[in-house]
Curated annotation (Swiss-Prot):
Protein source organism: Neosartorya fischeri (strain ATCC 1020 / DSM 3700 / CBS 544.65 / FGSC A1164 / JCM 1740 / NRRL 181 / WB 181) (Aspergillus fischerianus)
Residue ranges annotated for the Helicase C-terminal domain, each copy included: 793-943
Name of this protein: Pre-mRNA-processing ATP-dependent RNA helicase prp5
Skewed-composition ranges (Basic and acidic residues): 24-87, 94-153, 165-193, 384-393, 416-426, 966-989, 998-1009
Stated family: Belongs to the DEAD box helicase family. DDX46/PRP5 subfamily.
């Protein structure tokens, strides 16, 4: 809002003088009411800050404070339009914001007086047209001009306004000077009264006098500025700086005339430093003629003073001045720099004078701020001065030391002073100060920024939000904390996770296991009376049971002879098991006797019950489980489906015997299985991988194997195969050695049997119906078909099956070899209208379980599966098994076909063979013969053809067993590692690996034969001999490889023999001096010499050919392929030059190896490279120009 009595008219005529006069009276009247108005000093100046007609300017200049009224920089200084406003404007704006907040925290009386005085001073000088450039910067209280000097200066700067304006201006100046004298006298009176008080207030009075001297010291500079202003260019004479007037509008006790004429200066001994500084300023303000003579040296000092640093030469006066001008020292120094830089028309002397005037104005500000009529202002200032007196003294000393060195750049000193002002200001109004975020950001990033300034800015904003650099260095740690993780850390994490699955090895000697009982079987009397012949006859009747072992119990005929409990017998009768099957009648007595058993029986013969019933008796004999104890019975299976089926077979007995069982397999949530194990379970049916996870989970606190005494490996041949054997053995090693182990399977290859026996103790082997034999109840059909006719034949078989009403509820199981084939066949059958589903290892476990259940329940009659469903799957209505893709070995075929014809039922197994699968026909024909069925003629032809190829060495007989899948890459890596070790650690005694060497030689021979054939074809096409090949060397000829000569072990010790051999060597060397024929080495008789060697002379070949056989890349390839050693020896001799006696032979290559074949292959490859290099050299020579265009003369 506008002030009382003010007019908003920008016209300088008629209204300004009256407005300023009313403003002075109104300001005195409303001083108290406006004391608490924090915005009055900004809002009240807005009317006068509009465009005004200047006395000597014909254009309007934009007042920046209209757009930025809150910018205190604009309130304190006004920059002419000819000034550069690029960089300094932003800096002043930022500091103006700080000043705005500092003013809010000042004493309210002082602020009101400052606003009043500035308003009055501005209104008195608003329309002055004859003020010089410097007088515009200084207000009436700092110019120190008397009325006489004003009148003298007016003619020098004629005013474009009317003569009435001159009279008004003179009257205003006279009143202002009288008011200033009155204020100075009042202040001096108060100082004398305070000095008379004495006592503890004397110290504070000393500080006030020092600060009060600063205007007196600075006042002589103003009259000196007047003659300098007279010499300024005309456009600056009639202008003034309204910002400077606003800033200096506080009632100034300084005199308008020369120092000492109107103001009584207090005499103090401590003012000597200030007086010396005053003398320096007076000397600096000499007329331009005098200043120009020493402008270079004076410029440094004056710049220092111009930036508010001239006071630093005055130690004591500056201490008090810095305290009183707490919030303005930084801004003043910045503002003076901004005013001096953009005045190119001015000379150095004028700039220096302006800088000195700025220092005077800065000092006068101190007096205006401190000089007042109210006691509380002085008390607050004195208290602040008393608190900081000691600190300011030390800073003043540092400032003096810096002042001694000349500062070529005033900006640097300005930063120091601004920091000093900020550091002092922090004690008074740290909570109110605000640092511009851009300044804080730049000060943090700039390495050349003074650290004190940055520290002060951060400390001054301690109670406010700290300015944060969004892309500063402090964020680098957060950004790179994860990304800069070392590879070792990740490897450590991976190893740690890997170690979690490792089961710690158990030292059974240190463990204390509870004793347990294995033997529960008591042979019935009728069986005990049976002779061995009768027992053998009984075994023959029971499907030809074959047993092997010591003290094998006789087979039982009824369940009552097995020594089972009443609860178990009740469940057996409830399940409808009338009599034991063949495998059950022999295996149950053997297991109940506490013996380790290997049971091999046909599919569907009841092997699961054969090991479950003895286990229940075994568990019931031991004490119940306590908290955190593991199972007693452990059953491991290769597939998840088989584990689920065994667990399902246990359930009828568990409830009757009050036992608990847990089925643990991969694919299912492990948390549920952990919860069940923690509740306690006597039986665990699991797959090996998931069991290892459970044993390693929670540092082994989930479960343990300390109480396991009964272990079953179902489908044992698969468990000891390449895929499961390491995991199974790891688990078995953690179980007590005196456990009882039972192995069951429908197939048991001989190599698997030998491996399994290592885990057993004096086992009894029971074989029912032969190993790997298809049950006779299964009808086997094998057809040889092309790939494109298999699907049509499958549709025909399914149509014939379901055409009979008796087979309406029949199931059909179709086996394929790959997961993709299962999904493809499923899609094709669904298109033909057959409801079916697929199951394979790529599906989720929940899908696999639900599919098996739906298939058993008859929801869909056809199931397409891989071999994952070949073992243990028991579906009673399954009447048809189709091997859409032939199994790759005998055991897989037996298990696939055994899914049908179970428990005495009949079934059909159809197998499709293609011409490319004759390798598999051998096992299928063998299964047909063992089961007593005729082998079809097309299948027999395929078998004969394959066996002939095996005899001829073109094919390799397939081994029995699964052997693992997808391990070819691992085999290759293992073989390569073994070969590298052999080459690295050669001993010359690797005679046992002849097969590997032959295989390697054959592969190398095939590889190089192709290369040689291409080279030979190229050579045959050429009718002329290859150009560039030396005479006597045939690259396509036979390669001669020699065995390395070794000194005999028992060399003769006769000196004459040694002399004779030496002479022979000399003669031989002389006879072949300089001649390096192929196959004649010179120096390969060292201890590292290979068993075979060959040489190839390359001296006379073209350079490209020599490079082809000696560069590192080609040689490395040959070394890797052949395992030989290739060395370049001899010296190169130009064409036509032969080596003399005793000289090195011509350049040649020595190839050494452990076998003749390897050396031959390496030599063949080197010759090929030589030929290619020679051809390339001849081709390049043919393309080369005959002569150049220029000759060197």
């Amino acid at each position: 809002m506008a002030r009382h009595g003010d007019t908003r008219s920008p016209s300088p005529v008629g209204s300004t003088y009256s407005s300023s006069r009313r403003s002075r009276r109104d300001d005195d009247r409303y001083e108290k009411s406006r004391r608490d108005d924090g915005r009055s000093y900004r809002r009240s100046r807005s009317p006068e800050r509009r465009y005004r007609d200047r006395d000597r300017d014909s254009y309007r200049r934009r007042d920046r404070s209209i757009d930025r009224r809150d910018d205190h920089r604009d309130e304190d200084s006004y920059r002419p339009s000819r000034r550069d406003r690029s960089r300094d404007r932003r800096r002043s704006r930022d500091r103006g914001d700080d000043r705005d907040h500092r003013r809010k925290s000042r004493e309210r009386d002082y602020r009101s007086r400052r606003d009043d005085s500035r308003d009055r001073a501005r209104r008195r000088t608003d329309d002055s047209a004859d003020l010089k450039h410097k007088s515009r910067r200084d207000d009436s209280r700092t110019r120190n001009l008397d009325s006489k000097s004003r009148e003298t200066s007016k003619p020098s700067t004629p005013a474009p306004a009317a003569p009435t304006e001159d009279e008004k201006r003179a009257e205003r100046l006279a009143k202002l000077e009288a008011w200033k004298q009155k204020q100075a006298a009042e202040r001096e009176r108060k100082q004398r009264e305070a000095a008379a008080a004495g006592g503890a207030r004397s110290i504070l009075e000393e500080i006030d006098r020092k600060s009060g001297l600063s205007p007196a010291v600075g006042s002589p500079q103003s009259p000196a500025a007047t003659p300098t202003t007279d010499a300024t260019p005309a456009p600056y004479a009639g202008k003034f700086d309204p910002k400077a007037i606003v800033r200096n509008a506080v009632p100034a006790p300084s005199t308008p005339a020369v120092l000492g004429n109107d103001v009584a200066v207090p005499q103090s001994a401590k003012a000597s430093a200030s007086l010396s500084s005053m003398n320096n300023h007076v000397q600096a303000n000499k007329p331009p003629a005098a200043i120009s003579t020493a402008s270079s040296t004076l410029t440094v000092k004056r710049n220092v003073g111009g930036f508010g640093l001239g006071a630093r030469q005055v130690a004591d006066a500056e201490k008090s001045s810095a305290v009183k001008t707490l919030g303005f020292g930084e801004e003043e120094s910045k503002r003076k720099k901004l005013e001096r830089l953009p005045t190119p028309p001015l000379e150095d002397a004028k700039d220096d004078t302006g800088a000195v005037d700025a220092a005077v104005e800065d000092e006068d500000d101190v007096d205006m701020q401190d000089g007042g009529t109210e006691e509380e202002n002085a008390a607050a200032a004195r208290a602040a001065a008393e608190r900081r007196e000691e600190r300011l003294q030390s800073e003043a000393l540092r400032a003096q030391s810096k002042e001694a060195a000349p500062q070529p750049n005033g900006d640097v000193e300005m930063d120091d002073v601004s920091h000093q002002a900020e550091s002092e200001k922090m004690e008074v109004d740290a909570a109110e100060e605000e640092v511009d975020p851009l300044d804080a950001f730049m000060s943090e990033l700039a390495e050349t920024a003074p650290p004190k300034k940055t520290t002060g800015a951060r400390f001054a904003k301690a109670k406010e939000q700290q300015p944060e650099a969004m892309f500063g260095d402090e964020h680098d740690v957060d950004l790179t904390a994860v990304g800069e993780g070392d590879a070792d850390d990740f490897l450590a994490i991976a190893n740690k996770a890997k170690k979690k699955k490792d089961i710690p090895a158990v030292d059974h000697e240190k463990m204390e296991y509870e004793p347990f009982r294995k033997k529960f079987y008591t042979e019935p009397s009728n069986l005990a009376e049976m002779t061995d012949e009768e027992a053998a006859s009984l075994r023959l009747e029971l499907d030809g049971i074959k047993v092997r072992g010591v003290d094998v119990p006789k087979p039982v005929m009824k369940w009552s002879q097995c020594g089972l409990g009443v609860q178990t017998l009740d469940v057996i009768h409830r399940l409808g098991y009338e009599n034991p099957t063949s495998i059950q009648s022999q295996a149950i007595p053997a297991i109940m006797s506490g013996r380790d058993v290997i049971g091999v029986a046909k599919t569907g013969s009841g092997k699961t019950i054969a090991f479950l019933i003895p286990m229940f008796r075994h568990i019931r004999d031991q004490r119940p489980l306590e908290n955190m104890e593991g199972p007693i019975g452990l059953i491991m299976t290769p597939t998840r489906e088989l584990a689920t089926q065994i667990h399902k077979d246990c359930k009828p007995f568990l409830k009757a015997l009050n036992l608990r069982a847990v089925c643990a397999y991969g694919g299912a949530p492990i948390k549920d299985q952990i919860a069940e194990l923690k509740r306690g379970a006597e039986i665990v049916v699991c797959t090996p991988g998931r069991m290892i996870d459970l044993l390693a989970a929670n540092a082994g606190r989930v479960t343990n194997l300390r109480r396991v005494t009964y272990v079953v490996l179902d489908e044992a041949d698969r468990m000891f195969d390449m895929g499961f054997e390491p995991q199974v053995m790891k688990i078995m090693a953690n179980i007590r050695p005196d456990r009882q182990t039972v192995l069951f399977s429908a197939t048991f290859p001989r190599n698997m049997e030998a491996l399994a026996r290592k885990s057993l103790t004096k086992p009894i082997e029971i074989v029912v119906g032969g190993k790997s034999v298809v049950a006779p109840e299964i009808t086997q059909i094998v057809e040889v078909r092309n790939e494109d006719t298999k699907f049509v034949r499958l549709l025909e078989i399914l149509g014939n099956l379901y055409s009979d009403d008796a087979n309406e509820d029949a199931r059909a199981l179709i086996f394929v070899d790959r997961q993709e084939a299962a999904d493809t066949l499923l899609r094709e059958l669904m298109r033909k209208g057959y409801p079916c589903m697929s199951i394979h290892g790529g599906k989720d476990q929940i899908d696999r379980d639900s599919t098996i259940e739906d298939f058993k329940a008859g929801i869909f009659p056809i199931l397409i599966a891989t071999s994952v469903a070949a073992r243990g799957l028991d579906v009673k209505q399954l009447k048809l098994v189709v091997n859409y893709d032939a199994p790759n070995h005998l055991e897989d075929y037996v298990h696939r076909a055994g899914r049908t014809g179970r428990a005495g039922n009949t079934g059909t197994a159809v197998t499709f063979l293609t011409e490319e699968q004759e390798r598999y026909s051998v096992d299928i024909a063998k299964a047909l013969r063992q089961s007593g069925q005729k082998v079809p003629e097309p299948v027999q032809k395929m078998v004969d053809s394959f066996l002939e190829k095996v005899k001829a060495g073109k094919e390799k007989a397939s081994a029995s067993g699964f052997g693992g899948k997808g391990l070819e890459r691992l085999d290759q890596e293992r073989d390569a590692a073994r070969m590298r070790e052999r080459r690295t650690y050669k001993t010359g005694e690797e005679g046992e690996d002849e097969e590997d060497k032959e295989d390697k030689a054959e592969k190398a021979d095939e590889r190089f034969s192709k290369v040689v054939s291409s080279v030979q074809s190229a050579a045959a096409a050429a009718t002329t001999p290859l150009p560039g090949v030396p005479k006597g060397i045939d690259l396509d000829g036979k390669i001669t490889v020699h065995r390395t000569e070794k000194d005999p072990a028992g060399a003769s010790k006769n000196p004459l023999d040694k002399v004779g051999s030496a002479v022979a060597d000399i003669h031989a060397r002389l006879s072949r001096a300089g001649v390096m024929r192929s196959g004649v080495p010179i120096d390969n008789r060292g201890p590292d010499a290979g068993a075979f060697h060959a040489t190839l002379e390359i001296n006379d070949f073209p350079q490209k050919a020599r490079w082809a056989v000696t560069n590192r890349t080609n040689v490395a390839k040959i070394l890797e392929a052949t395992g030989t050693s290739i060395t370049t020896k001899g010296s190169f001799y130009p064409a036509g030059k032969e080596p003399g006696p005793g000289e090195n032979p011509k350049l040649y290559i020595l190839v050494e190896g452990e076998t003749e074949l390897a050396v031959t292959n390496a030599m063949r490859e080197l010759m090929r490279l030589l030929k290619e290099g020679t051809l390339a050299a001849a081709d390049s020579d043919a393309r080369a120009p005959v002569g150049g265009r220029y000759n060197v003369v």
